[in-house]
Amino acid sequence: MHTLTHDTRWDGRWIWDHTDGTEKNAYVLFRRAFELREVPASSVLRITATTRYRLYLNGVLLGEGPPKSQPFLTYYDEYLIEGPAATAGPRLVRGDNVIAVIVQHVGYDDDSRGGLLAELRPLADATRGRPVSDTAPPVAPDTGPGPGAPIVATDGLWKVTRSAAWRADTFFCHFNRVVPYQEHFDARRLDPRWLEARYDDSTWSDAAIVHGRHSDRPPRVAPWTRLVPRDIPFMEERSTYAQTVAETGEVTAATNRTRSGDLSISLSQPARAVELATIDGPEALLTADGETALACSTAHRSDPKIGIREPVLMLDFGRIVNAYVELDVEGPAGATLEIGYAERLHDGHFNNAIEGQFADAITIREGRQRWRVFAWKAFRYLRVRVHSAFSPLIVHELVAVETRYPFEEHGAFRASQTKLNEVFEMCRYTLRLASNEYITDTPWREQGQWLGDVAAVTLGGIYACFGETRLARKFLRQSAATQYPTGFLGNMTNTYSANWQNVHVDFALWWLMALRDYYRYTGEEEIVHELYPTAVGLVEAVLAYRDDDGLVTDMPYVVFIDWAAVDTTGASAAFNAILAGALKAMGELARVRGDGWMTDRAEGARRRIADSFAAVFWQQDEGLFCDAVDDPDGVDSGGGRVPTGRYSEQTNAAAIVFG
């Protein structure tokens, strides 16, 4: 069974601090200490949050999540926690225990507010006959006692504090809706003992329960009105080190008066050869062993005209990776490491201020510490700059912890030409980069699950290279959930925008064909039945704009054709060709559904387009289909529709493919 079941069985309550939860880029810490006299053989911890959580059990990182969700389709995660017999990993113990959670509320999505929901139960109580995860075997209903009280669940007994260690007013990369904020973390402002069971949290507040209209019991609490289990595996992680130190140098400290909160400005400053700053042992950054010493110059203390020189270095990982940067460092309190990310160099130089201003920074506390950025980034080049380190800052390790969808490579391609094999491997690796807890158009810039990009391009590659269907199924379902009252779907479907007017209508048609292709590939009828109403609503929304020739014309929404220079004025040939393909797909889905009326309606509409297409769009003198025809003077002018004068490869290719 692959239908995504809406879960109404929660004893936990949504909690937050004592604000309205709408603050952007807010980091909130939660703790719940508890004592166990007996430890269950196994337990399950269910958890979700808006927007992203990092979960610890007894000081050990348990996991991160949930998959990026819309408020009306919120994923939750489940963690199996082994009992006292476990020899490794996070586990419960007899006596004092603590669950600690960091939640970042990004706040970019419409109708978003911060919240945390969690509960810990003995395994038999938690599952109640349901799988622990999409990949786990079902747990029999009779493996334990009936449902009882949870061990702990989010409620007013949890402790909460708004963390001052993370700056909220950091630079905002407007084109990224998933991780738009640079992270500025000051380790001096967070006591690392907060993860310990016996930490004194008496100065923290009691958590505030978020109330719904009629109840505070999920799912009766808006905006989280539908809670569903993660339907894809957890991501796999592996440690990767840079291949080369591509640059070492120093820069003169200067005040950023352009965008003072934007780290990418200082990280893009050109460097000179090292003269006064200290960079000792940079090659140690290429392994897990060794030490690299970084320090700012001190010559300015005797000669102020010199200025402060700060060390910079750039690491090349040899390929683009999706990774969390993790540092093991020690040095003087107040020293700051800035980290900039880039996919490519510009004229041989690092400059991420002009494309994607992705950067993070840590200000360290005294002594040795380990830090991991909160959000992964896509990069090949990493540039590090150090401020305020007038005694050596020691980097024991700088590692990129790659996050990857756990694909298995079931697909293969072999050719006698080496170049073709190389191209295939490049494509397969690109698909790996584009696949995480959602499918992105680019993991570097937007991290957006663009409806048309994924449906038209990416899914077929995932099937061919990996034979994987769970991620595709999640995309189809999550995209369907964005359907507006107009019948059209959202453009970016791992986020939510209430702007119903800004839709790409052709993208939605590709989604419809992707649903048909998924059925062809898997033979799974369940998702066809589940998403069929969405498909019908979409088709009816488009057909409402047909003219007397059966062609869609004067579409008020965007017909995008993915950046191509195609004229879509009036009646668009490319769009109507794509619509013909989508109507064929709709007919196939209707037959699976047993809906004879829609089968006939879709086939009839497709036939009308086919009958009119050549007569309206074919230009004999050019030997081509024109991009569009329009009545420039209006419907009642009497002049009729005329070609708009543009011809494109995209239009004529669409006519061939869908004709």
Residue ranges of model-derived segments:
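Secretory-pathway/luminal and periplasmic proteins that interact with or process carbohydrate-rich
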Residues: 54-55, 107-108, 406-408, 485, ...
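Short amphipathic alpha-helical coiled-coil/interface segments
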Residues: 535, 602-614
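Aromatic-rich carbohydrate-recognition surfaces in CAZymes
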Residues: 98-104, 352, 358-394, 416-423, ...
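Beta-rich carbohydrate-recognition and catalytic domains
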Residues: 342, 474, 600, 604-607
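N-terminal leader/propeptide and maturation segments of large enzyme subunits in energy/redox metabolism
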Residues: 586-598, 602
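Extracellular/oxidizing-compartment recognition motifs
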Residues: 1-444, 453, 470-473, 491-493, ...
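Solvent-exposed loop and edge beta-strand segments that line ligand/cofactor-binding
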Residues: 314-317, 372, 439-451, 495-508, ...
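A generic structural motif
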Residues: 64, 68-69, 558-559, 632
